[in-house]
């Protein structure tokens, strides 16, 4: 069986936004966030693919989740760093954060928003799991708990142990990167949730509709890379 690539954003969304895979999504979020108490429930706020996603190569195929305590978590898979990536991530966080406040509400009603980016590339950062907050320059006091952006660079997964990351996050990174399909069998033997993730990916890979969606997205990504290469060659990027 040819498995769909979980690094492809449409496959990532189909896998983790599916109602019958809430346990996988909860496990993934727990591995990244390491909350002080268990995540009791997750509600996917955007389970459907955006309109015109196939024709618009710039559309984001993220998974927006609301936790039991009202915290919103946005999870995104990126196969390569975009230009102005930091500004892009911050802008997207700001839009989500502002969207939690209704007209006339007090600022105290703003809900925390966490953005999680799984990136299949290395940036200038040196860590496998980078966590960005807003802190005072001298005493490093935290300005607000509300701003939190996690970036997990999948190629740096071998650094996970040295960074004292959880075994669960290391396993999820290996699952998402999936350089060798045989790695799934190894992961499945290490953890029951990984065995369930393996089964879910195999089932998704058998669906003709998922195969078609993945092919459309691959073609769009290929066309986008060609456009960027042409821009660079002509000095526009």
What are these regions (language model features)?
Residues 1-237:
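Elongated, amphipathic alpha-helical interaction scaffolds
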């Amino acid at each position: 069986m040819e498995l769909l690539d979980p690094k492809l954003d449409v496959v990532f969304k189909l896998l983790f936004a599916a109602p019958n895979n809430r346990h996988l999504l909860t496990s993934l979020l727990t591995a990244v966030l390491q909350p002080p108490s268990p995540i009791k429930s997750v509600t996917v706020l955007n389970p459907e693919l955006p309109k015109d996603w196939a024709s618009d190569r710039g559309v984001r195929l993220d998974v927006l989740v609301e936790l039991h305590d009202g915290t919103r978590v946005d999870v995104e898979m990126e196969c390569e760093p975009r230009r102005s990536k930091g500004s892009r991530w911050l802008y997207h966080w700001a839009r989500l954060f502002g969207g939690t406040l209704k007209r006339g509400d007090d600022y105290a009603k703003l809900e925390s928003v966490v953005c999680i980016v799984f990136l299949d590339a290395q940036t200038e950062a040196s860590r496998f799991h980078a966590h960005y907050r807003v802190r005072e320059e001298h005493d490093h006091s935290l300005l607000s708990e509300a701003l939190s952006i996690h970036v997990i660079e999948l190629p740096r997964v071998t650094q996970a142990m040295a960074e004292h990351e959880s075994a669960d996050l290391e396993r999820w990174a290996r699952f998402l990167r999936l350089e060798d399909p045989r790695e799934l069998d190894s992961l499945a033997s290490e953890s029951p949730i990984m065995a369930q993730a393996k089964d879910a990916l195999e089932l998704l890979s058998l669906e003709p509709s998922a195969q078609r969606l993945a092919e459309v997205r691959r073609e769009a990504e290929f066309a986008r890379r060609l456009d960027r290469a042409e821009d660079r060659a002509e000095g526009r990027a």
